[in-house]
Amino acid sequence: MFLKLLDKLGRKKTVLDRGPSHPKYNEAKPWMNRYYLLLRHRPKWFPFNILIHEMLADDHGDGVHNHTFPYITIILRGGYWETLKSGKFWRSPGYMGFRSANNLHRVDLKKGTKPLTIFISGPFGLRKGPRSEYGIDFKTKK
């Protein structure tokens, strides 16, 4: 009910699994519903934001990604598999993760679930380090 209220207030954004510059943009599918609890359009100078993420699909492609800011994530519902350099871990409801901007990771969902998280993004910064696959075969998720 709370998410429906945020939607009615214009605080929801559906993020697709690829952007308009992608050659197969016409095949884009919803990847995540993002609900803005604090700022819908956060200025870069503002130090943080608070959102709710409703994940609809696995992370794009076969590799890992990082963020342009440090962040905290708190799982409210569902859970997901997170792949880090140190291995693949199940993150269940109640899990709280603290990540730096140069942390590389990948999120994969359990089939038929839509995990819900509180996502607190920190101050913007530049990405550090290369995106790599850590030697993990992401196609087989091993």
Predicted regions and their residues:
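A short, N-terminal "cap"/entry segment at the start of jelly-roll beta-barrel domains
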Residues: 1-49
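A glycine-rich, hydrophobic/aromatic-adjacent loop/helix-cap motif
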Residues: 18-25, 123-125, 135-142
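Conserved short histidine dyad/triad with adjacent acidic residue
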Residues: 49-67, 101
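Short, solvent-exposed loop/turn segments at secondary-structure junctions
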Residues: 57-58, 80-81, 103-105, 122-126
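Short, conserved beta-strand element in jelly-roll/cupin
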Residues: 66-81
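Short acidic-glycine-tyrosine-enriched beta hairpin
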Residues: 83-106
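A short hydrophobic beta-strand segment most commonly corresponding to one strand
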Residues: 98, 112-129
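Acidic/His-leaning functional-site neighborhoods
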Residues: 102-104, 109-111, 127-142
